[in-house]
Amino acid sequence: MPKRTDIQSILILGAGPIVIGQACEFDYSGAQACKALREEGYRVILVNSNPATIMTDPEMADATYIEPIQWEVVRKIIEKERPDAVLPTMGGQTALNCALDLEKHGVLAEFGVEMIGATADAIDKAEDRSRFDKAMKSIGLECPRADTAKTMEEAYKVLDMVGFPCIIRPSFTMGGTGGGIAYNKEEFEEICRRGLDLSPTNELLIDESLIGWKEYEMEVVRDKADNCIIVCSIENFDPMGIHTGDSITVAPAQTLTDKEYQLMRNASLAVLREIGVETGGSNVQFGINPKDGRMVIIEMNPRVSRSSALASKATGFPIAKIAAKLAVGFTLDELQNDITGGATPASFEPTIDYVVTKIPRFNFEKFAGANDRLTTQMKSVGEVMAIGRNQQESLHKALRGLEVGATGFDEMVDLDAPDALTKIRHELKEAGAERIWYIADAFRAGMSVDGVFNLTNIDRWFLVQIEELVKLEEQVKAGGFAGLTEEVLRQMKRKGFSDARLSKLLGVAESEIRRLRDQFDIHPVYKRVDTCAAEFSSDTAYMYSSYDEECEANPTDKDKIMVLGGGPNRIGQGIEFDYCCVHASLALREDGYETIMVNCNPETVSTDYDTSDRLYFEPVTLEDVLSIARVEKPKGVIVQYGGQTPLKLARALEAAGVPIIGTSPDAIDRAEDRERFQAAVERLGLLQPQNATVTAMEQAVEKSREIGFPLVVRPSYVLGGRAMEIVYDEQDLRRYFNEAVSVSNESPVLLDRFLDDATEVDIDAICDGERVVIGGIMEHIEQAGVHSGDSACSLPAYTLSQEIQDKMREQVEKLAFELGVRGLMNTQFAVKDNEVYLIEVNPRAARTVPFVSKATGAPLAKIAARVMAGQSLESQGFTKEIIPPYYSVKEVVLPFNKFPGVDPLLGPEMRSTGEVMGVGATFAEAYAKAELGCGSVYPEGGRALLSVREGDKQRVVDLASKLVKLGYQLDATHGTAVILGEAGINPRLVNKVHEGRPHILDRIKNNEYTYIVNTAAGRQAIEDSKVLRRGALAEKVNYTTTLNAAFATCMSHTADAKASVTSVQELHAKVKASLEA
C-alpha cells in the first residue's frame, strides 16, 4: 500500500527534557521521523519542551512548539494547527502518556485527530499489566506469576501468591521509577507505598522474582500487511534483577541455541500481532531460566525505545525512520534500505558479522548518600557502544569509551590486601556500576569461572571470555616489553587491548607501544556497518575499527573536517554538546567540506549515519582518534564542541601533528590554567573574586585567613563542578581536604572567595579575530553558588541594568581578543553591589548554546564552525547581538526522585540531567511555562512554609508579603518567624525536627503544605534541614532552595502558562521584524 493521501498534516509528540530512563535517543528518533514524513510531503507539527534537541531546530518541522508536553497545552496547539493525525510513538513514555490523556479528555475526537503508529487500545493493552497478562495467556505465552494491586491490602494478597523475593513495579512509569526488589516485609511495605504514589494510575504490578535468569530483547518491526522483521536480538550480560537500561548488553545474542532463538523470534511476532501494533517498531523482553530453559515474556514497549536506538546503531537499520513511514501506510517491501543504496528493501532482516557491546555510564559520585547498587530501577545517565570483530575486542573498546579512567580491565583491588577477596565477593554478589572490573579481579585472585557464576549468574560463556583476557595480561606482563614480538602484539590488538593498557601492564610510555606498532606496521583497518554482512556493497561510510586484513574505509582526497563528539552522556556533559557537534557537521557539509564524525554514544543524532559524510563509531581516545586521522588525513579537527572529552586530547593531538582548527590548544590552556589566566585578567585590569591555588592543606588554611570565608573550593580542570563545595569555616575546609580530594603538586586545589547573594550571568559569544559578536546574555535566577548548569536563566536579562550589561559586553570583547579565540566562547560573571566580577572563561561550546540559538534564532554553533573553517562573521552577515522582543527561560530537571537519601539542595556540583524552555511576552509568563514544562505545578494558594538562613532574613519579609497577596497562609520556623513578626506578618510557628512534635516533617507528611521555601548555609545547618528537603521531595511538595527562585515563582503566579502557544518559526519572525525595524 502506498502512503495515505487522506492525511496532510501530522503532529509529532516529543519526549521533553532528558531524565534518567529517557535520554537523547528520543531526539534521534524524533528527528528521523520529522525528516521521513516531510520527505513524503506531509506538513509536520512538532511539540517538545527541550531546546537542546536537533528536532526542535526550526528547519526540522513546518511548525515547532517548544511548549510543555501537557494535554491542555497540546490541545491549544491542535486547536491552532488542526493536524489530521498525531504520532505518539517517537517520544518515549512522555509522548504515550500525553496521547492517552488527549484521548481520555476527548481532545482527539473533538478536533477529528487520528492516532497513527499505535492505537490507544494497543498502548493500553501493552502498558496495563493485567490486560497484558491476559493477552499473553491467550496466545500460549507464559508471563511471570504476578498480579496488580491498587491498595496495600491488595498488595499483601498478591504477595501470598508470588512469595519473596518479589519484584514491584508501578504502572505507566518509565525507567522502573519507584520500583524495586523486596526480600522482606519491611522492604515490601516501603517499595509498595512509594510505587502507589508514583504511578499515575496508582497501581502496582507485583511479580515473582526472576533474579538470576537470563534476559533477552527482540527489536521487531511490523507493517500493516503483517510483514514482520526482527531487526536485532539483544542479550543482557547482566541477568534479570538489573534494569535493562543499567545492564551491559550485547548484540546479536551470543548464548542462545538456534532452537531457542527461533522460539523467541516466533513469540515476538505473536506478541506484536496480539497487542495490535499495526505499524512500527516495538521491543519485546524475555527471561529464560538457565536451569530448565523455561521462557517467560516480561514486557513489550509499543514504541521506539532506548533499545531501538541501540539496535538502529548496531545494525545500521533506521528503525524510527522506517516506523514513521509505516505509520502513514507504506509496507516494508516498498521502502528502500539507504545503507545498501537501495539494493535491498527494508523487508530484509539485517544480518551482522561483528559484535556490539553497550555499557551504561553512571554518575553516583554526584549523589552523596545514594544507594549505588543496581536494581530494577534505572540509575544510569548515559551509555557507550562499541563494535568489534569478536566479543573481547568489542568489550575492550566499550570499556575505554566509557571515560571513567579505564584503559581496559584495570585492577580495582590490591590483591595483597587482607580483605581483598571479601571485597571482590561483595561486589560480584551485590552488583554496582563497576562489577565488570571486579570480575576480572576475581580471576586474578584465583577464583574459577563456576565460582564467579555462582555469585553473579552471568553466563559462563561471557566469564570465560574475560578469564582468557586476564590470562593474556599475565603472560604479557611476564614476558616484559622485550617479549612483545610482532605476533604477540598483533594478537593483543585483535583482542581489543589498548596501547594505554599495554603500556600500564609493561610499565612503559604509551608512545612506546605506538612506536612499536609503527615499526611492525600493525594498524587498525576499518570495516563498514552495512546491514547485510557484506553481501551487497555499501556506499554508506559507517565505520568501526578492527585488526583485520582488509580495510574498507576507502578515504577520498576531498577537503575534510573531523568533528570529535562527546562520548557517553553524563551529568555535566550531555545532549547540548552533541547538538553543537551535529551543527558543525551540517554547516561544513553545506560549505562543501567532507565531514567526519567520531563518537561512541548510540543515543545521539551525531552517530546517525546520515548526519555526516563519514561516521567512525569509535571510542574518543587519543589512540583511536590518531588511527582515524592516519587514514583520513583531515584538513582540520574540531575539539571545542564535544565538551571536556575531546578538549582533553587537544594538546596530544596537536603534538602528533593533527591540525586543530579554531581556538588553539594553547589558548584553551590559557583560559583553563589558573596562573596563565590570572596574568591575562590582570593585564586587562578586570575584577576577579580573590583566589589562590594551593597544593597542601596547611597552605590552604593559611590562604583562607587572607581571603576570608565563605570559600568555593574545587580541584582544577573539572566539568560540571565535580568535587566542588562551598566551605564556611576552617574546620569545614580541613574536612574537605581530608575527605573530598587528594591534593598534590600535580593536582592543585583552587580557592575562591564566594560572592554570597551575587547574581550570576552567562554570556555566549563568537570571535573571528576581527570582531566579537555576543550571542546572548543570560541572567541566572538562582544566585551565585548554584552551579550554572543547575540554575534557571532568562534571556534577555530580567533585572540587570543596561549599564552593567554594557560593562560585561566590553569585558567579553577584551577577553576574546586577549585569548585569541576563533569560534565560540562562554564567559561567566557575578554581579554584586554594582560591581562585575569575572568568574571564568571557556573558549569552547557551552551547554547554553542550543538554548541561545532557539531563543534568538541565530544558529551559533553553525556560525562558529564556519568561523573555525576560515569564514569571517561579516561574510556570514552576523555582526550584531540579537535581543529578542520576548523572554525565554531555561529551567533544569533534576533526578533526585531516583536517588532516595540524597539531599536535593542545589550547590556548586552540577546534578541536573536535562532542561526545558519556556517563552513568553513577559518574564513571568516564560518562567511559568518553563516550570510547567519540567512538571512543577504550583497550586493557587494553600499553606507555604518558610525556613531561611541568616543571610536571607532581610529579603524574606518581602517574599512573605508577596505570598500572602497570592492567597497563601504562612508557617515559619523560629528564626524566620521572629523576623516576620517584627514586620507585622504573623505566621504559624512550627517545630524543627529536634524541637519536639508535631514537627515540620509530620506536617509535610500530613500534606499540610503546597509550597516550601528553605535556604541553608554552613555544613551543620544544611545537615539539619536535609530531612525537610527530602520530605518535600518524597511527598511531592513544590519546594525552592534559593530566595531568587521563590521570587520568580511568585511572579509566575501572575501569568497563565496554558493561555497561548507560539511556534519557534513565529518567534524567529518576530526577531527578524524587530531587527528590520
Curated annotation (Swiss-Prot):
Mg(2+) 4 binds at E840, N842. Mn(2+) 3 binds at Q828, E840. One of its GO terms (molecular function) is metal ion binding. Residues 1-403 are annotated as: Carboxyphosphate synthetic domain. GO terms for biological process: 'de novo' UMP biosynthetic process; glutamine metabolic process; L-arginine biosynthetic process. Residues 404-553 are annotated as: Oligomerization domain. InterPro entries: ATP-grasp, CarbamoylP_synth_lsu, CarbamoylP_synth_lsu_oligo, CarbamoylP_synth_lsu_oligo_sf, CbamoylP_synth_lsu-like_ATP-bd, CbamoylP_synth_lsu_CPSase_dom, MGS-like_dom, MGS-like_dom_sf. Large subunit of the glutamine-dependent carbamoyl phosphate synthetase (CPSase). CPSase catalyzes the formation of carbamoyl phosphate from the ammonia moiety of glutamine, carbonate, and phosphate donated by ATP, constituting the first step of 2 biosynthetic pathways, one leading to arginine and/or urea and the other to pyrimidine nucleotides. This is Carbamoyl phosphate synthase large chain. The gene is carB.
